[in-house]
Amino acid sequence: MELNKNYLTQEGFKQLEKELENLIQVKRPEIIRLLQEARDQGDLSENADYDAAKAQQGEIETRIAEIQDILANAKLISDHQAKTKVTKVSLGSTVEIYDYSSKSNEKYTIVGTLEANPEEHKISNESPLALAIYGRLIGDECDVVGIEVPYRVKILKISNR
């Protein structure tokens, strides 16, 4: 697993494509219109509407460039990988673990950093938990380190998303 790659699921890739399309097709023209309206008001040196629209334009253009870079350098978690019987924890795996410290079962999907969302139990492949369980098998126990309070987990189940 190359840690510095932009790992994306097909779903995450499509979401970024959709966001990019919206920024280019909807947001960019909207800002251009707002800038023109602000210019039509006259003196730009003290025009708050123009300043706000110009700042918004900068944010949109920055996000467009960022998404284009992410998509150009993305490494997709392949459909083949998602359909293969999983024996080891890997990128795209959904893993059920037992956390000895909280005495509870938890389920996480390992995704690239850009798709990580703790509320949806999607953890980054660079997170301490993912690094601890990556490449492990069902039944393996391991310590999650690199955090303030290390803890121990046991892998109960590995499946594909």
Swiss-Prot record:
Q: Cite the InterPro entries for this sequence.
A: GreA/GreB_C_sf, TF_GreA/GreB_CS, Tscrpt_elong_fac_GreA, Tscrpt_elong_fac_GreA/B, Tscrpt_elong_fac_GreA/B_C, Tscrpt_elong_fac_GreA/B_fam, Tscrpt_elong_fac_GreA/B_N, Tscrpt_elong_fac_GreA/B_N_sf
SUPFAM superfamilies hit by this protein: FKBP-like, GreA transcript cleavage protein, N-terminal domain
Q: Which domain of life is it from?
A: Bacteria
Q: Which GO terms describe its molecular function?
A: DNA binding; RNA polymerase binding
**Where are the annotated coiled coils located?**
8-28
Q: Which family does it belong to?
A: Belongs to the GreA/GreB family.
- The protein, known as: Transcription elongation factor GreA
Q: What is the originating organism of this protein?
A: Mycoplasma genitalium (strain ATCC 33530 / DSM 19775 / NCTC 10195 / G37) (Mycoplasmoides genitalium)
